[in-house]
Amino acid sequence: MTKVDDALFEHGASAVAVEQNNGRDNPTKPKDANICRHLKLAAHHIPHHLAVAVQQGKGKSFANLTYQELDFISLNKQSDAIAFALNAYGLTRGMKAVLMVTPSLDFFALTFALFKAGIIPVLVDPGMGIKNLKQCFIEAAPDAFIGIPKAHIARRLLGWGKASVKRLINVDANQSGVTDTLSRLLTGAPSLASMLSFTTKSSSAKLPEQVEYPMALLEHDEMAAILFTSGSTGTPKGVVYSHGMFEAQIQALKQDYGIAHGERDLATFPLFSLFGPALGMTSIVPEMDASKPITANPEFLFAAIEKYQCSNIFVNPALLERLGRAGEQTDSKNQHKLSSVKRVISAGAPATIASIARFSKMLSDGVPVLNSYGATESLPISMIASDELFTTTQVTDNGGGICVGRAIDGVKIEIIAITEADIPEWDNRLCLNAGEIGEIVVTGQMVSQSYYHREKATAASKIWDSERQTFRHRMGDLGYLDDSGRLWMCGRKAHRVDATQGGQFAKRYYSIPCERIFNTHPNVKRSALVGVTVKGQHGVGEIKPLICIELDQSLVCNKSAQLYQELMVIAEQYSQTQGIRRFLIHPDFPVDVRHNAKIFREKLAVWAQSQTKG
């Protein structure tokens, strides 16, 4: 983007920016908080700049991959047309619609159309499992189901949303290779294309093509979407997102991460890719299964970065590792050099120092990998650049936790004592001192206020702050603040192990500090702390810490006894791990379905218990 274009874009947004004061410290709320206003501004000021490019198929060579593209004005017009069609189909403001569409041009246009119409998209992770998906649909009670043919077939077979769904839309885009009639027979739903055609033909004025859709005027705290957590840290819950939350996230990406209009982003996570057009940034979507990033073909991603000269990359730790390994294996003559990239954002779980260092070899000098901390309920919370993170390695390897940086501007982080009890009202006396490990509590405009129809879960994770007139969110993560205000992660509250002796509490173990100590052993790829119950004196059950070990892929351990002995020696050298004397080798750790990076310790705990005798 030229400087003139950028200035015009900023001028067009100035009224909103002044009114909201960057969406942070001014309590005044805009009368129109619909997140789609950013797309309309882009369509007006940079109409023919590329908004979205989606890779089509796998291609015969990486140099000749094809992409479908939309500029900002076309994306805006298509979303307008779809919004008109949704209204004509009986979907109106305040209704809820499940959206199960793979990353595509339709995905972008549909999502913005829903926002424009004030229809609330319900987003779920297909990998969370059949039982969890069905429960999500029961709780959300959607009015409509919008999905690709596979999603509709699953809906019919498994009864998803049967009690509430009254409107169905099939998003095929002729990808299945079947006729519209056959597709409707298989899915039980009319196609999006047929709806658009009908809406256009039924209007002599051809409204969807020639008239701008009257975007719904929404309040700052009005529900914008329901985003279900993946279930990797517990039962999936619907997080209520307001338009104000989305606005705060956009402002954080602009101000704290430095993303500017005219940039191009390699978008590897569907939800984050939607921020591109809202930021005046192009979203480049490579061919990959976003639910299984570890299966992505690195060459597709490298080719997309090269073709579109991407300046930003959003990845999770699993994909960061995969891309870094691929770059490392390339011979020197064909070494990948990502010269256009000026920032990498890693989120979803803490990336390892080794992964970051390996990936950074492909970047130009001084280009940071920005490690972000947050959750579906509140994102982003804090951030640390790779150069600073590298200086914390020794602390992490010695059981000090993982540094996740300082709070994003406008976010307040506090640490409170560990408790399972609900905390209805905030009191500053709850706060622990610097260096004390407790539960992380956050507040800010990107922090959610409730779970959808989950009153108990809301009560367990929200604390009302009467002074700020907002809820603080209990992250369910443990950590501490150092003297300079940096946050250090020590693992999930549910993953701590409170060991007992003689039926009484003996010692508390935290997952990340313990695991990072054992990960320093050269044969250990990663480790996981779990608790097992063993028989103690007089037959009383005792809870003991156990470390599950995943070996480096190049190793086959036929000397486990020797390894365990070496690990016990390591354990006794640190106060955080003293007393750990049980170890088990696991072939392949189960991981979360969304990022393929968070270790599923709950499953490991069940496995470890089955392997434990007495």
From Swiss-Prot:
ATP binds at residues 229-237, 371-376, 477, 492. It holds the Pfam family AMP-binding. SUPFAM superfamilies: Acetyl-CoA synthetase-like. Belongs to the ATP-dependent AMP-binding enzyme family. Keywords: ATP-binding, Ligase, Nucleotide-binding. It comes from Shewanella oneidensis (strain ATCC 700550 / JCM 31522 / CIP 106686 / LMG 19005 / NCIMB 14063 / MR-1). Involved in olefin biosynthesis. Catalyzes the conversion of 2-alkyl-3-hydroxyalkanoic acids to beta-lactones in the presence of ATP. The S.oneidensis oleABCD genes produce 3,6,9,12,15,19,22,25,28-hentriacontanonaene, which may aid the cells in adapting to a sudden drop in temperature. It catalyses: a (2R,3S)-2-alkyl-3-hydroxyalkanoate + ATP = a cis-3-alkyl-4-alkyloxetan-2-one + AMP + diphosphate. Its EC number is 6.1.3.1. Disulfide bonds: none annotated. This is Olefin beta-lactone synthetase. The keyword Ligase applies. Disruption phenotype: Deletion of the entire oleABCD gene cluster leads to the complete absence of nonpolar extractable products. The oleABCD deletion strain shows a significantly longer lag phase than the wild-type strain when shifted to a lower temperature. The gene is oleC. GO terms for molecular function: ATP binding; ligase activity. Signal peptide: none annotated. PANTHER family: LONG-CHAIN-FATTY-ACID--COA LIGASE (PTHR43767), NONRIBOSOMAL PEPTIDE SYNTHASE PES1 (EUROFUNG)-RELATED (PTHR43767:SF1). InterPro entries: AMP-binding_CS, AMP-dep_synth/lig_dom, ANL_N_sf, ATP-dep_AMP-bd_enzyme, OlefBLtnSynShew.
